[in-house]
């Protein structure tokens, strides 16, 4: 069952590189900030995207969320991206893990569903909901 919205992030693509021209396969890195369960966070994420059919991408990524000076959580994710006139719209899932005892401790073993977009200017936005 889809639960409450957990996060809202905004950021910018900070780097891209071609991993393979057969396919092709692209790696994208994003720096973002926002709110996760009421806590202000900074996020660094990297994902690899490959085309699966005309106008559709398959992406796999990983990231780190930081809150305060030392509170951290890591995640992996997988999503399907579809090209639009404004960029690429992603839908997928994120899987968290952390040994944090701080504000991010409640993310441990949480699965989230995501809606994200990277526009043609490299702006990134994401909303996530807990999947219970």
Task: Locate predicted features.
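Beta-strand-enriched cores of mature, soluble protein domains
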Residues: 1-132
């Amino acid at each position: 069952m889809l639960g409450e919205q957990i996060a809202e992030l905004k950021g910018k693509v900070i780097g891209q590189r071609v991993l393979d021209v057969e396919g092709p396969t692209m790696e994208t890195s994003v720096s973002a900030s926002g709110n996760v369960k009421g806590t202000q966070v900074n996020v660094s994420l990297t994902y690899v995207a490959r085309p699966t059919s005309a106008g559709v991408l398959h992406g796999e990524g990983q990231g780190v969320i930081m809150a305060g000076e030392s509170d951290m959580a890591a995640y992996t994710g997988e999503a399907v991206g579809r090209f639009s006139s404004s960029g690429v719209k992603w839908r997928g899932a994120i899987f968290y893990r952390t040994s944090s005892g701080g504000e991010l401790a409640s993310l441990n073993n949480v699965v989230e569903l995501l809606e994200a977009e990277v526009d043609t200017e490299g702006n990134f936005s994401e909303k996530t909901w807990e999947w219970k």
